[in-house]
């Protein structure tokens, strides 16, 4: 692609509005970077589908040359140069590393990184299902229609306007997409819970019961039940989710609607639930939670695992940007939002809670303790 000579000359000479040619070229590069941002996701998706992380990992400690990778992938030799170009951007993004191979002269080889380790399909905390789920065309399609959606006067989400059904209804009608989504959420849960259980140990000591609201198929409930065998754990979710699931000694599944009733417990646990809902819906859920727990003096509290969006001047650029990406994903799929501390506080006060503590120990997410 080549710019028209007159346009290129105009940019280099400035635009007549006080902007220098260098400033305009920098602005142009900034725009191009965002135009092509989607390529990072697609390149990563391609690498995972080709099993490149597995090949590099299994070849350790030796680096894998391009020719060896072509052979391992069983792709046409004619596409070697294209594979090199794919790897080049993934090395630039930090997903793979490159090194000189001494025994092969100046030939280069590829090595895995910590990020690519988390993309291994058999890794207990693999992020591959999350990657493949969130870049699935069904999930991305609503974002193509944001501008049309903003002009609509109804209360449909972009997902509903695109696919003719809400996200949850769509999953009920397309089991394979529900499975993809559940796998995506499961991988996030496994990674986070390894930290949560360590960080929550002191927060859960002394309690006798806990209910995991919207706990799905019980990944969190099982982890807590195993880590705290003296705590009675209850997983609450809709009948179609938990109706056929069986518990264990200190774990049970209960069918129900969190907007109507939450089983009594010392602690109510909400992992990535409230960000799915708008403020009015969140307040309803929080009020049901407050009804389910004892007073603060008796040890009652909520534990919320969710995002607290960084203030403009706090947190790294990358982490804040990722939080904002999450927020627009929620806008596309559901009625929810990622919230700042101020926005969380308004919800807690409106639902009748008196205090809260935020512990930012989960990377992009935080542990929020809320007290009646």
Swiss-Prot record:
InterPro entries: COMT-like, O_MeTrfase_dom, Plant_O-MeTrfase_dimerisation, SAM-dependent_MTases_sf, WH-like_DNA-bd_sf, WH_DNA-bd_sf. O-methyltransferase involved in the biosynthesis of etoposide, a chemotherapeutic compound of the topoisomerase inhibitor family. Catalyzes the methylation of (-)-pluviatolide to produce (-)-bursehernin. It catalyses: (-)-pluviatolide + S-adenosyl-L-methionine = (-)-bursehernin + S-adenosyl-L-homocysteine + H(+). CDD domains: AdoMet_MTases (cd02440). This is Pluviatolide O-methyltransferase. Mostly expressed in stems, and, to a lower extent, in leaves. Its EC number is 2.1.1.323. GO terms for molecular function: O-methyltransferase activity; protein dimerization activity; S-adenosylmethionine-dependent methyltransferase activity. It comes from Sinopodophyllum hexandrum. Belongs to the class I-like SAM-binding methyltransferase superfamily. Cation-independent O-methyltransferase family. COMT subfamily. The active site is at 275 (proton acceptor), 306, 338. Combinatorially expression of Sinopodophyllum hexandrum (mayapple) genes of the podophyllotoxin pathway (e.g. DIR, PLR, SDH, CYP719A23, OMT3, CYP71CU1, OMT1, 2-ODD, CYP71BE54 and CYP82D61) in Nicotiana benthamiana (tobacco) results in the production of the chemotherapeutic compound etoposide. SUPFAM superfamilies: S-adenosyl-L-methionine-dependent methyltransferases (SSF53335), Winged helix' DNA-binding domain (SSF46785). It holds the Pfam family Methyltransf_2.
